[in-house]
Amino acid sequence: MKAVVISDIHGSGYYAEKIKEINERENPDKIILLGDLYYHGPRNELSQEYKPMKVAEILNSLKDKLLVVKGNCDAEVDEMISKFKFNDHILMEINGKKFYFTHGHKYNIENIPYDDFDVMIYGHIHQGFIQEKEGFVFANPGSISLPKCNSAHSYIVRFRIVLF
């Protein structure tokens, strides 16, 4: 299975368009979104071309490919405009490895929910990384729209971070 992992769109119509381009270029089986889809949050600047309804329209057009976890900026009202399900987390096996996908505000490299996985991928911190710790692999795709700490706009494909 080929998957693309994207996090922290924060309502950017501009970067939602980039997701369409990524889908066309990579042609993944699944696009895994790690939360914070529409709202920018009180601590973030407005994202480029802040248009949450445009983001919803684009994501809804990709609904058959989407697996989505709920972020700390996602609310019940966001689910009303979405034609896909928001999950607290996603567990799946890919190529014999157990993956745990979450937003990252509750569970992350510093706060592991349990140990029945091989790889944990989470968003929230807006900085991409891949790191091994205590026999587990932890990865973060960074933020597609609002990278922090001088990091680049990024996502994960084939479980490698792609900067653009």
Where are these regions (language model features)?
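Conserved beta-sheet core of the metallophosphoesterase superfamily
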Residues: 98-100, 105-164
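Core catalytic region of metal-dependent phosphoesterases/phosphodiesterases
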Residues: 2-94
